[in-house]
Amino acid sequence: MLIIDSGIGGLSILDNIKKKFPHINYIYMLDNEAFPYGKKKEKFLIERSIKIINAIKKIYPIKMVIIACNTASTISLPTLKKTFSIPIIGVLPVFKPAIKITKNKIIGLIATRSTINSLYIKKTIYKYSLENTIKIIATNELAVIAEKKVRKLSISNIKLKKIFQSWIILSIKPDTIILGCTHFSFLKKEIQQIFHKPINFIDPGDTIVNKIEKYFYQKKIKKNILLCSKYNKQIKQLVFFLKKYKFKKIQEINLN
């Protein structure tokens, strides 16, 4: 199984997969050279995803790919499914669980600007906003804050409050928040503290397991591997955090 993201966000997806399937082996492609995907153009994301999959397929017997980034999934998934014969699974903002859980019918969606502006998300918001109020925050900065947190660097509570200010000032705030970026899962505690009230978080990682379960019998990779597009200081800062994922090897892969 190959998991692709530009940063550590996809590791939140991997956490959910490991809970259900603790003995699986995986390759995690941390495309840090192109971080963050949320700021990249559609053409770049499609071409980059194809390049990554082709490069890794030449080295390892991958049988399934998870695009563990909401932005890349909303943009590149249709093309990738046409290009490759192996299963390609994307991570998309999940609305149905939010509709079932919300008590006040006010749902928050926070995602990158590219995800919010995608046709898929616009159609989905229109569909579910007929009976619910959906409040939207488009931000690329929150992914950067999540990266800082896992590297044990200081993060600004003032910046977090500024990002969520449009919701904080509401007299009736969202009681359910859809996390539209895999990075945001690492900031649940900080987001919860900002609102001073219980929040239902809808995490894309909670639903990904059901999508991939039927493919695990094809597993052939014998150890866990982390590939990065550039081995640098930021990757070295992640080494301690990555220990729990039991990667046997961390190496740079040439995509040029």
Curated annotation (Swiss-Prot):
PROSITE patterns noted in UniProt: ASP_GLU_RACEMASE_1, ASP_GLU_RACEMASE_2
Pathway per the UniProt entry: Cell wall biogenesis; peptidoglycan biosynthesis
Keywords: Cell shape, Cell wall biogenesis/degradation, Isomerase, Peptidoglycan synthesis
Organism superkingdom: Bacteria
Swiss-Prot/TrEMBL GO biological process terms: cell wall organization; peptidoglycan biosynthetic process; regulation of cell shape
The protein's enzyme class: isomerase
Catalytic residues (positions): 69 (proton donor/acceptor), 181 (proton donor/acceptor)
EC number(s) given by UniProt: 5.1.1.3
Entry annotated with the keyword Transcription regulation: no
Catalytic activity, reaction form: L-glutamate = D-glutamate
Record-listed substrate binding positions: 5-6, 37-38, 70-71, 182-183
Family: Belongs to the aspartate/glutamate racemases family.
UniProt xrefs under NCBIfam families: glut_race
Main function: Provides the (R)-glutamate required for cell wall biosynthesis.
Listed PANTHER family: GLUTAMATE RACEMASE
Name of the featured protein: Glutamate racemase
Organism: Buchnera aphidicola subsp. Schizaphis graminum (strain Sg)
Gene behind the chain: murI
